[in-house]
Amino acid sequence: MFYEIAQITKVLISPVSWIVLLIIIPYFLNARRKWLCRSCWIVAGVMFLVFSNKPLMLYTEGQLAGEYSNTSMKDGKTYKAAIVLGGFAKMDAERGNLTYESRRAGRLWEAVRLWKMGRVERILITGDTSSSLKDGVTTKPEFIKYMTQIGVPDSVLIIEQLARNTRENATNSKAILDSLGINTADCVLVTSATHMRRSYETFRKAGLEVDYYASDTYSAPKSLSFRDFYPRWKCVQEWQYLFNELFGRIIYDVVGYG
């Protein structure tokens, strides 16, 4: 039930939903309420200008990332596993390749980079939607084959497919690590910088004494030009991700997950 409510809420808090709703509402209002129609369109226009503003979006992203844009990994330490939060791609079973989510794909590649550098021994991917289809048929073999083709052997990978949210990422990961006899203090959590605070606090609350390493880190632009303020529809869509994270933090604090 918690998962279903979260999915519905994502739609309700989306700036895209607000703008579209304000545009279409006037068509269902009485023609005599022209002032209300105009008001809806004006508000929709103002919201579009605000949420299509890239500098504002980047500033908000930086505030959400905060101190978690850095890493708490210890110099010279080799970790038993990197725990990567899923949702970064979808698996095309017919073509055997991945379609990446632009904001999340860095999680996987940073974990692979850490492994190639010898900083981690294994990679645990939790809540990996790229390895399962809607009808429940697993594409895990295709995913492992793909990773093998890019140089990551299957012996390195641990794939957990059941987690649907950050809380389940934590509890399911702990169960797997405990079964393998891996101390969670020897693991590092890898996810997006804006998602790291909620993830890290949730994992710690679930009993995982992990360090963290953020991907997709934020860096403030050194200078701004007039063109930086041009409206961008992509920015409106990306606010969805930021609102989801902000709302998620509030909910996790309320229910005691974080």
Language-model-derived ranges and their functions:
Residues 1-29:
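Membrane-embedded alpha-helical segments of integral membrane proteins
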Residues 50-232:
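A structural signal for short, hydrophobic/glycine-enriched beta-strand patches
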Residues 7-10, 31-41:
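Membrane-water interface of alpha-helical transmembrane segments
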Residues 218-227, 235-258:
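Extracytoplasmic/luminal low-complexity segments enriched in Pro/Gly and acidic/polar residues
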Residues 1-9, 56, 60-64, 239, ...:
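Hydrophobic alpha-helical segments of integral membrane proteins
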Residues 25-34, 52:
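Structural signal for the C-terminal ends of transmembrane alpha-helices
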Residues 39-53:
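Hydrophobic membrane-insertion alpha-helices, especially the h-region
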Residues 11-18, 45-49, 148:
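Hydrophobic alpha-helical membrane-embedded or membrane-associated segments
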